[in-house]
Amino acid sequence: MKHRIGRVEGEILRELTKILRKDIRDPRLSDITITAVECTNDLSYATIYYSLLTEDPAKEKEVAEGLDKAKGMMRHLLGQTLTVYKVPELIFKRDTSVAYGSKIDNLINQVKKQDQERENKNK
């Protein structure tokens, strides 16, 4: 059963990415990336994780509103391509791991830069 859920999750991820690029014309959704999909065991709900390249709270709210507005159309289009009896209800959540990873990367780069400056002063 878990293998089937994983396969459906991958299929939803692939199809939603296509739908966002080709069928949804909302400019609020142009900068998002679908990062993961998690389905419940009975496939009645699918949690869709997405990332943004910005940390602007106003932009985050716009994207959330755009996703909520386009949810019905996305579910309808998914129903045309998915090989499941019932299309899962879509729940969108922001994936903050990408932003967190970027923040950690910046901190590491700052520490490296400080170390190099200290080495140059000691020479």
Swiss-Prot record:
Q: Per UniProt, which keywords does this protein have?
A: Cytoplasm, Ribosome biogenesis
Where is this chain primarily localised? cytoplasm
Highest taxon of the lineage: Bacteria
Q: One Pfam family of this protein, by short name? A: RBFA
Q: Where in the cell is it found?
A: Cytoplasm
Task: List the record's Gene Ontology CC terms alphabetically.
Answer: cytosol
Any one Gene Ontology biological process term? maturation of SSU-rRNA
Q: Name one GO molecular function term.
A: ribosomal small subunit binding
Record keyword Nucleotide-binding present: no
* Quaternary structure and interacting proteins, as annotated: Monomer. Binds 30S ribosomal subunits, but not 50S ribosomal subunits or 70S ribosomes.
Its function, per the record, reads:
One of several proteins that assist in the late maturation steps of the functional core of the 30S ribosomal subunit. Associates with free 30S ribosomal subunits (but not with 30S subunits that are part of 70S ribosomes or polysomes). Required for efficient processing of 16S rRNA. May interact with the 5'-terminal helix region of 16S rRNA.
Which family is this sequence assigned to?
A: Belongs to the RbfA family.
Name this polypeptide is given: Ribosome-binding factor A
The protein's organism comes out as Lactobacillus gasseri (strain ATCC 33323 / DSM 20243 / BCRC 14619 / CIP 102991 / JCM 1131 / KCTC 3163 / NCIMB 11718 / NCTC 13722 / AM63)
Q: What is the phylogenetic placement of the source species in the record?
A: Bacteria, Bacillati, Bacillota, Bacilli, Lactobacillales
Which gene name belongs to this protein? Answer: rbfA
